């Protein structure tokens, strides 16, 4: 990753332990330990982040993403969609103040996509900063506040929902990139 300047998370140096404890990341390609179960992945993250999430809250997250009956499945037994759900649950289990989701809906079934959108709106209502990187603009149509458009690794423009009203995201994207409308 090449960049100029500094990166901060809630006014903390991004590499600091304090910043890492409030920051969650859901990668585009979830990485799972083959020999750990779904539950062990959750517990691993809870301990690594010294999370104060309760067992009841963990169960509620697993239930929302239909993983309660998959807790004993090993990482190497899961489909891409299931791994994505586990990755999302792990991120939520640290109770982040900032969360970065990279193509989070790829591989998810329609019900899980709907659930993730609801979770994102709940996080937003609770003051969590949410960053979503996606090429599937229609997936974030009803949940975005600010859109940055990148081209060749550089931000070429941005919009806020307040500025553009009901204009569709793909129209805004094409406006910036000069593509088809």
Language-model segment annotations:
Residues 134-135:
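H-loop/switch region of ABC-family ATPase nucleotide-binding domains
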Residues 99-103:
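Catalytic Walker B motif of ABC-type/P-loop ATPase nucleotide-binding domains
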Residues 114-126:
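Helical segment within the ABC ATPase nucleotide-binding domain
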Residues 43, 47, 53-70:
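Conserved ABC ATPase "signature" region
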Residues 74-81:
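Conserved ABC ATPase signature
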Residues 140-142:
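A short, surface-exposed alpha-helical micro-motif characterized by mixed small hydrophobic
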